[in-house]
Every structure is written in structure tokens, then in C-alpha cells.
Amino acid sequence: MRKRTKFYMYSIAVLSSLGIFLSSCTRASQPVQKGEFDDKVVIQTAQNQFYPLMRAFSQLVDLYNKQFANTPGFLPVELQQSEKTNATSELQLTNNVVGSIRSNSPLVPNIILADLNAAYQINGFNRLLDLSNNPIINESYFDSDIYNNFNKISGSTQSSDKVYAIPFNLTTTDSLVFNKPVMNLLFSLVEQGGGTVDKNSATYKELHMEDFMEKIPNKKWKNLQVKSNEIYKGLTVDDKTFSNLESLFEFSKKFTEGLELKQTPTVTGQQRDLKVFMLNYGPNIYQKYLWSKLGNSRDSWLWNLKLQDNQFDLDFSNLKKTANQNTIGETYDFFKNNYTTLNLNDKQVLKSIYFGTGGKSDWAAWDIRNFDTAFGIASHVGWNQSVVSPFTIRTFRSTQGDVTQQDINNAKNNFASADDVLWKTQLTKLDKNNLN
């Protein structure tokens, strides 16, 4: 049975949420030969098996295939994660699929999780699925703010009521998360260096613990000391410190600059680099920061949709303004200038800020779990990866086969417990001088 090929994609860069774009991928004038993607529904993504969404999605696909296997007209669903697609970003996945369309390949998936750029590119091939008359997926089904973000792309018309993206999942990717034992060490060092820690602040009260040094495993945090008892004079750590991105950056740098190694370090050997502040999805964080500096509105952003001859196109007038170009340079310099390091020996450093690369090994939640970062910005859906949990016990072990009591003991000895980690809500304030 030859099926029509469709597309679904998601948006994470604009709304930090998942959405789906739909596309028809066959043309009567350009028939494609029967291939291995026929007679099934293929979903492709740039996310690997460690993404929380993929763990849930894969189980949902398995459940669907089992429950509907005997339904007339049933097509099995195959989820292809980045291990199969070899795409590690939405852009790369989009380029792969667009290349397959251009070459008239039979290996064009039915569903892909990507972004608005993908919808724009596929729309250029006239492949977006028209849902105008769909009784469920229409304007009334969505919140107006979400709908208005997904129903207009370059090349669409003013009168179009198509939904180019379907919101799939609303989850914050930038929650503030703390490793409580390491944070208490930071507080102690700030006070040793003449700084002030507001112990009446809500943040301190949530993070405070007495036996924090006993909870930190054999990490080089224990090799650190302040350069002098006045190095942090004038520094106050309070709720404002953790209320916005700029203050977090500045604190991370100042704290790192005030440290040195003890003359006789007690922890030796090569380990993973330590970080004061680690962030996931760095490009998205920078984009939001730049957005705030450019005016915090759609009209002041570097590019916008403009209507010309009843059709939307991209307008780059704001990008050409000298003031905005200067703002780009200033925001870049702010990120760059707040980065500093301290040599920890053994080819290891302490970094004031660090942008995780994701993939299979570089996530803020994982560093929080391993006591390798003090605080970070991470995806809240990754909570169970930031603490001792059935997932972390099963996944992060050296043995194979069934989980043993030794695996459980190793996790408890090396990973942060749920009581050692504090997750907060999304960090929405970026500019310390404009907290609106």
C-alpha cells in the first residue's frame, strides 16, 4: 500500500515549546519509487535517547503499535532518533530532509520534529499539509498567542488560516537549578573572602544545609580557597543575585576570580572540569538576552514578517540599524567578558560559565547530579537525571545486565540525592536593570 508522506516539526527556539508542522511530500508529477519508508509512518528527530521527550515518545509509539496493530488500515509507527538520523540539531535535520525532497528520494520521513525554518523551507516545495478544514487542528484549538506564532511564515498570505506548526509540548528549557552542597561551599568561601551572604534571603534559606562538605564527593571543589580575606569585600549574595541572567554571570566571574588552589591539594587526578554556572541551549539563552536588550518586543527584533502584496516576507530593516548592530556587539562582549577560568591541575579547570553542548554527555542536569557545577539553567523535564533515581542508577553505571545492589550503592555514593538538588522555575529576567 503506497501512503502519502506527511511532515510534523517542532519549535523550541522561539517559544521553548514543541510544535508540529505538517507537509505533504509527494507530487503527482514527480513519482518516487517504492522504498523502505513505505507502509509505515516514520518519525525523525534530532534528539537522542537521553532526551526526556524521546524516552516518553518511544514508549508512546510502542504502545500505539501494540494497541492498534489489528485495526483496519493500520500503519506501524517507527521513531528514528538522532542515533538513526545522524542529525544533532533541528537545522541539520531540516537540511537532510530538504535534500531528500530535492533529490526525489524515497527516504523522506512522514513526521519530523524541527522548527519554523523547516516549515518555511518545506513550504517552498508546496509540501505543507493543509489543515484548513480540519475539525480539531484549527485556530479555536490553540491559545491565541501560540496560534499567532505558528500560522504565519515567509511566503504565506495574510488571509491564510493554515496552521504551519502544531504545539506538541510546553516545557521550560531554562529552569534554574542548584546543587545545594556545592552552593553552601560557595557561600562559605564568599564569607571567608569578606563578602556578605544574606541569610534572610529566600534563596539562602532554601539552599542552606549544615553538613554540606560531607555530601560533596571527592571533587576538586575541596582544593579551593580564597585569595585573601578581603577579596570579596563589597560583594553581597542575596535573592537579587539569582533573579536575572546578568547578575548570575557577574557573580560567577567575580567568585571564580577570587579563588586559588590550596598549596597542598587533597584531591588529585584528572576529572571533569568544574563550573560555577552551566547553561543548556546557549544559543537560545543568548537570543533571549539579545531580545531583552533590543526592546523586548516583536517589533524591535532584528527581523520581522512584513506584508507586501498580500504575502508575508522577512524584513531585516532593524538588523541594518547601527544602534542594533552595536547592541549585538555589546551583548556578545558581555557573554565573553564574564568568562574566566582557574587552573585546577591535571588538565582540569574551573570555569565561571559554561555552555553545555548537549548530545550524549554534556548537560547541566548531569553536572548538577555529579557535583560538577554549582548552579545551572536546565530543562525541568530532566529532573530525574539530576538526582539518584531509577533512571540514573540504570543508565550511568559501568556494568551491563540487571541492576545490582552495588550499582545502587555506587549511585548513592557519587550522585546527588533529591534533597541535595533544588529546582526553581524558569529564569525569565535577563537584564538586571530592567526586570519587567
What does each model-found stretch correspond to?
Residues 14-121, 198:
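Conserved N-terminal structural module of periplasmic/extracytoplasmic solute-binding proteins
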Residues 116-214, 412-431:
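Hinge/lid segment of periplasmic solute-binding proteins
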Residues 42-45, 110-114, 165-168, 174-178, ...:
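Structural recognition of the beta-strand scaffold that forms the well-ordered cores
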Residues 156-284, 296-347:
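Helix-loop-helix "hinge/cap" segment bordering the ligand-binding cleft or interdomain interface
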Residues 249-252, 282-370, 375-377, 384-390, ...:
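Glycine-centered hinge/linker elements that transmit conformational signals in sensory
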Residues 1-13:
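Membrane-penetrating hydrophobic segments
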Residues 39-41, 73-75, 105-110, 162-163, ...:
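Loop/turn elements at helix/coil->beta-strand transitions in domains of secreted/extracellular proteins
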Residues 86-130, 143-166, 176, 256-260, ...:
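Pocket-flanking alpha-helical
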